[in-house]
Amino acid sequence: FKGVVAASYGRIYFKNLIGRRTSESTALNFIANGEGYLGQHTLATLMFALSSYEPPAEVMESYHVPAEGRITESAEGEEKVHLYSYRTPDYVMGSVLDYHPGEPGSQEHVLQVMIKDCDTQIWINHPGEAVYFGEGRPGYFAGNGTLPLIRQDKNCAVAEFHLLDQEVQYTHAFCPLEQFSEWRLEGRWLFLKKDNICAAVYADNGIWITDKGPLKNYELVSPGKDNVWKILVEEESVYGSFEKFIHKLHQNGGKER
């Protein structure tokens, strides 16, 4: 999406999640398609740039997304892990479905949303440690202490958590509010707008925006061992306005799908 990987990962680090422009894969995308960023990782980038290799036509075609969006599903690895992604020209939502829910996690990145660019992103996880920028595997934002059950249908995803007896007894979302042109917290809902795209984040146990420290306006916290998060992304034109988007979700109780 826009030249960066925006999907579930089997192994992730916080520095990679927030530093999308620095990954080697984005430089490869830049050379192949003109989208992405050139960084300081040069091994594969240099070999690709100097070689005569040209990606197959089907790979190049995958860069182009129709206006109505595209669903991509695959089974990866020895366990045939079910990866699901829905991508439009303006946003992408990707997840791993039914991956060991309720079991201890590691560095799996299980749910990811990007809107318009690689800086406007949202993901939900259970912190594997209480230290913000520690060395734990899983960490505070990278990976999950307890893995959730995830379901996704195109632009809507649900993450159901039942936490084990671990250090952190809440779940949270990374959500940089400064990247959005408008946002509004109403009850258990956080509504957001970025240009022509609307998004809604919901948690059964309520949402609190971290209002101090290094994560001020970057973190959404929801308490409790048992919790359900929902996230929906849609074009504003589908509803007519941001206000109508909010009204519709309140009216339907979030049951858009």
Task: Annotate each predicted stretch with a short phrase.
Residues 2-257:
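Ser/Thr/Asn(+Pro)-rich, low-complexity disordered segments
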